[in-house]
């Protein structure tokens, strides 16, 4: 009975048998946590190396390449939009900073107190475009690594296996106490509220046309909002499918027979994946 596998909610996930599909869900969750921890210990350039590594990894998944390419294109567009938005905010910040410094110098000259005046400067950015681009790439790389790694895991693992892998851990059971299904049901409403709040922010910014920031970033903000709205609608759809999948199979802690169906032993490939991922991040950190 323990070897029996139910047909998951998405048939294309269960029908594929690539190397990434065969890795246990617990190992994939560990790799995700390892990637997210790397945000705090790796530099910009090393994060770009991690992003390219994810792209190379996705290219090795020979099955379902159409789905992989579709999600890669969506995530890449969102990452580029995040970089452009950050770069626009950086330019607007630098422009307003110089304008404020010029205004302070002019007022000081008018009051004849220029002898001891030292203009206030904030040295976050210089005039070099490369430094501003490097600063703008950071949020884009964060976004790409986070979202694309999650999508790769979701493509190669059924929603039920991921949910049950989290559900069977002792820490989650102690914290949530059989509320996992409620969390998945609630997540779709949370993302829906995010879309509504983004629409309100856009309306407020459009009404306040006198803002200096609006003159430099309205177009890119509108584009970023439209892409984000499309992206969050995809997440709402994913979350709804997960909640429906869990609900139709009557997930609860007392149903031991149901949990036994998904129990499986860790294999050699799982140990190899754990070793390679841990060594890879360690080498990037020490180099």
From Swiss-Prot:
Subcellular location: Plastid, Chloroplast membrane
Membrane topology term: Multi-pass membrane protein
Membrane-spanning ranges: 32-52, 72-92, 133-153, 175-195, 216-236, 266-286
GO cellular component terms given for this protein: chloroplast membrane; plasma membrane
Keyword Cell inner membrane: no
Keyword annotations of the record: Chloroplast, Membrane, Plastid, Transmembrane, Transmembrane helix
Origin superkingdom: Eukaryota
Family per similarity comment: Belongs to the ycf92 family.
Protein's recorded name: Uncharacterized protein ycf92
